[in-house]
Amino acid sequence: MSEQLIVAGFHRSGTSLTAQLLSHAGLFLGEWLLEEDQSNRYGHFEDVEVKNLHGQILSDCGLDWRVTDTVLPVITDRVWSRIEALVERRCTEHRLWGFKDPRVCLFLPIWKYMLPDAKVLAVYRNVADSTHSLKKRHSTQMFSNSGPNAVHRSFFEDPDLAPRMWLAHNREILTFASHYPEDTMVVSLDMIQDAFPLVWALNKRWRLGLRDVSAFEVFDAQATSRERRESPIRNEDLADEVDAVERELERLSSNTEAMLTIGDQA
């Protein structure tokens, strides 16, 4: 019987670090992974096949990856066939597999429909640090003439674009978690950086059989800044919405941290 673990989280939120850790622990993440680049020196650990599927769904909806609202996906027969083929192949070939792609936040119900027993590990980072990192990436790419300039400029022409994206993705995580609390675990990037025993927690909760690997075996402290920044949000209503979502994410991650205390008492 095959088991699945999906890694979900907004862009620049620590999902690559998390996926790298889980890969070392024995989670199969795909045959073809997105390679390292100047914004992610150790690689994204991102399944290109899944990334392309999500990109196609967004394109069919007239969108790109800069999503700022709930997506009502249009799934063509061709895309359904590709998803079904991927699921059948992976379930046949791997006892435990999963994938990581920030876009999956927008499509978690689709994957839950295809994989009813799948578990979701949701990783979040505070909005100020996450959006700062995203803007920094696009500033670097813009000045190195890498990728479409219109996309890079959009983050500076509309300063609230990145926070709106952060809100849309993390809201979808919370919606999924509210419907499937037993199949969702929420952690913060801070927890992982502070040596929370993530692999142990996953095995304890879902008995996945991962090798118990410490984050320090794969974590490069220089690769992810821990500098705290002020909120970049200009619109007060948006700031209030983001604050509410952050508080709920913090509550759920606190529940995950509480596993340590429960484990000590057991």
Range-by-range predicted roles:
Residues 1, 174-177, 196-266:
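PAPS-dependent sulfotransferases, especially Golgi type II membrane carbohydrate sulfotransferases
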Residues 1-81, 218-226:
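PAPS-dependent sulfotransferase catalytic core
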Residues 15, 43-46, 76, 80, ...:
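A structural signal for well-ordered alpha-helical scaffolds and beta->alpha junctions
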Residues 28, 63, 183, 255-258:
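A general structural signal for well-ordered secondary-structure junctions
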Residues 31, 100-101, 264:
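Pocket-edge structural micro-motifs
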Residues 49-56, 78-82, 86, 161, ...:
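Exposed alpha-helical structural elements
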Residues 56, 63, 85-212:
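PAPS-dependent sulfotransferase catalytic domain
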Residues 65-84, 164-169, 245-262:
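Electropositive, surface-exposed helix/loop patches at the edges of structured domains
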